[in-house]
Amino acid sequence: MPKIKTNRGAAKRFKATASGRYKRAHAFHNHILTKKDSKRKRKLRADALVAEADTPMIRRMMPYS
C-alpha cells in the first residue's frame, strides 16, 4: 500500500508535541503591527496549542508527525 502524503501547508504551520498535541502560532502578528500595543504583540509571540476538536483533522493531514 502506498504511503499517505503529508499536507505540506499543515506541516509548515503545526508541530507535534511529545504529549501528542500540536503547537501553532497566533494569527494577527505578521503585518499592520504599528496600531497594536506592545502587550498584545508580546502575547501573540507565544505558541498556542491546537484545540482538541481540531486535533484529529491535523493528525489526518500529518500522518507521520
Curated annotation (Swiss-Prot):
<dbReference type="InterPro" id="IPR018265">
    <property type="entry name" value="Ribosomal_bL35_CS"/>
</dbReference>
<keyword id="KW-0687">Ribonucleoprotein</keyword>
<protein>
    <recommendedName>
        <fullName>Large ribosomal subunit protein bL35</fullName>
    </recommendedName>
</protein>
<dbReference type="InterPro" id="IPR037229">
    <property type="entry name" value="Ribosomal_bL35_sf"/>
</dbReference>
<dbReference type="InterPro" id="IPR001706">
    <property type="entry name" value="Ribosomal_bL35"/>
</dbReference>
<keyword id="KW-0689">Ribosomal protein</keyword>
<dbReference type="GO" id="GO:0022625">
    <property type="term" value="C:cytosolic large ribosomal subunit"/>
</dbReference>
<dbReference type="InterPro" id="IPR021137">
    <property type="entry name" value="Ribosomal_bL35-like"/>
</dbReference>
<dbReference type="Pfam" id="PF01632">
    <property type="entry name" value="Ribosomal_L35p"/>
</dbReference>
<dbReference type="GO" id="GO:0003735">
    <property type="term" value="F:structural constituent of ribosome"/>
</dbReference>
<comment type="similarity">
    <text>Belongs to the bacterial ribosomal protein bL35 family.</text>
</comment>
<dbReference type="GO" id="GO:0006412">
    <property type="term" value="P:translation"/>
</dbReference>
